[in-house]
Amino acid sequence: VYAAPKFSTELKSWWYPIVGNMAYRGFFNETDARSFASKMQGEDMDVHIGGTPAYSTLGWFDDPVLNTFINYREEDLADLIFHELAHHHLFVKGDTTFNESFATAFAQIGVTEWAKAKENPQALEDYLARRQTKHMVNQLYVQKKIELKAIYESLETEKEKREAKKQFIAEFRQQLNDMSLSDPRLSKLAILAERPINNCLLYTSDAADELTSG
């Protein structure tokens, strides 16, 4: 569960042992997550509930094999494994953006070298194409978060911010739909355009790519 003030792109964080402050609250049960999200909404926060296919205990425990990723393509499964292993090797307390960006870059390098060793150039090409498309989308969210932050900072009253936010979301929705029609690789953006868009979603969509170059 992610939460942010109505007129801020900075996420609320929670402190955990070992890992420090994290910009999300984790749950193993969806009902509990939705209950907590409702509580945050009651405090006038934007909220976003997102799932994750895997998680890392940073080497403290044996990490489980879950049914959320066993049917992944081979290269995407390798990407996930490299990503989670990266957290074992380097994890900066309280810096979600750095940790996720580092793990993303580490995974891409790992999969590239692994696929080369398997001598499967087509699989590598397909993987890198999927990765590049995902990076393009995430960088779009990075830019939109910057734009929305500037809007909030340029206005003084809540009424002005509320109206500007509403217009920003409507225009962003249209942009997602337009992009989905203009590029076959981005067809799934039409699905994103139908989902709730708020301060939290802009952050959660870009955190793993904000410091990477693609």
Residues covered by each model-derived region:
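Acidic/His-rich structured neighborhood in mature extracellular/periplasmic domains
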Residues: 1-134
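Long, amphipathic alpha-helical stalk/connector segments used for oligomerization, subunit docking
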Residues: 124-169, 173
